[in-house]
Amino acid sequence: MIIVIIMPKNENNPNIKNNNHQSPKKRIALTAGTFDLLHPGHFNTLNFAKKHADELVVVLARDETVKRIKGRRPVIPEEQRKIMIETLKPVDKAILGSLTDKLEPILSVKPDIIVLGPDQTTYQLEELKNQLLERGFKTEIVKVEEYVKCPFHSSYDILKEIIRRWCNKEIELK
């Protein structure tokens, strides 16, 4: 004798596998920067961003973009910076930015939140929000307010100190 028990479909029953059930959408945060000579400010921004999401995607500025904006190329080449950033604990994925459209990586990733570092100058919060809205994309954008103060809180300061120590002279970089 075979007994067949037919159980009604019930979302609350753990014994029933619902193939239509989708796992909850992971919240994605995106932050961007050069991340050339790593310092505590970078880690502060990355940790802040990760606290606001399940996944953190970091967009690294391309060497040519950095040269155009800052007037100098990064010390560490983009592919090497990408390897360094993607191995950091809070980072789930690192991608290189676009050479032609700074919004392209954002529109590709479609983050739930964009985190701007405290010294971010490439993106201004309201300007970025408006540019994304013009392209039909709405997302939360926050700026890290806490600026980590320490002797070497910027890549620029680290570079100046290296030159001072190695060349034994003070210089002003572009």
UniProtKB/Swiss-Prot annotation:
<dbReference type="InterPro" id="IPR014729">
    <property type="entry name" value="Rossmann-like_a/b/a_fold"/>
</dbReference>
<keyword id="KW-0285">Flavoprotein</keyword>
<dbReference type="GO" id="GO:0006747">
    <property type="term" value="P:FAD biosynthetic process"/>
</dbReference>
<protein>
    <recommendedName>
        <fullName>FAD synthase</fullName>
        <ecNumber>2.7.7.2</ecNumber>
    </recommendedName>
</protein>
<dbReference type="GO" id="GO:0005524">
    <property type="term" value="F:ATP binding"/>
</dbReference>
<dbReference type="InterPro" id="IPR004821">
    <property type="entry name" value="Cyt_trans-like"/>
</dbReference>
<dbReference type="GO" id="GO:0003919">
    <property type="term" value="F:FMN adenylyltransferase activity"/>
</dbReference>
<keyword id="KW-0808">Transferase</keyword>
<dbReference type="InterPro" id="IPR050385">
    <property type="entry name" value="Archaeal_FAD_synthase"/>
</dbReference>
<feature type="binding site">
    <location>
        <position position="147"/>
    </location>
    <ligand>
        <name>ATP</name>
    </ligand>
</feature>
<keyword id="KW-0288">FMN</keyword>
<keyword id="KW-0548">Nucleotidyltransferase</keyword>
<keyword id="KW-0067">ATP-binding</keyword>
<dbReference type="Pfam" id="PF01467">
    <property type="entry name" value="CTP_transf_like"/>
</dbReference>
<keyword id="KW-0274">FAD</keyword>
<keyword id="KW-0547">Nucleotide-binding</keyword>
<comment type="subunit">
    <text>Homodimer.</text>
</comment>
<feature type="binding site">
    <location>
        <position position="119"/>
    </location>
    <ligand>
        <name>ATP</name>
    </ligand>
</feature>
<dbReference type="InterPro" id="IPR024902">
    <property type="entry name" value="FAD_synth_RibL"/>
</dbReference>
<feature type="binding site">
    <location>
        <begin position="39"/>
        <end position="42"/>
    </location>
    <ligand>
        <name>ATP</name>
    </ligand>
</feature>
<comment type="pathway">
    <text>Cofactor biosynthesis; FAD biosynthesis; FAD from FMN: step 1/1.</text>
</comment>
<feature type="binding site">
    <location>
        <begin position="34"/>
        <end position="35"/>
    </location>
    <ligand>
        <name>ATP</name>
    </ligand>
</feature>
<comment type="function">
    <text>Catalyzes the transfer of the AMP portion of ATP to flavin mononucleotide (FMN) to produce flavin adenine dinucleotide (FAD) coenzyme.</text>
</comment>
<comment type="similarity">
    <text>Belongs to the archaeal FAD synthase family.</text>
</comment>
<dbReference type="GO" id="GO:0046444">
    <property type="term" value="P:FMN metabolic process"/>
</dbReference>
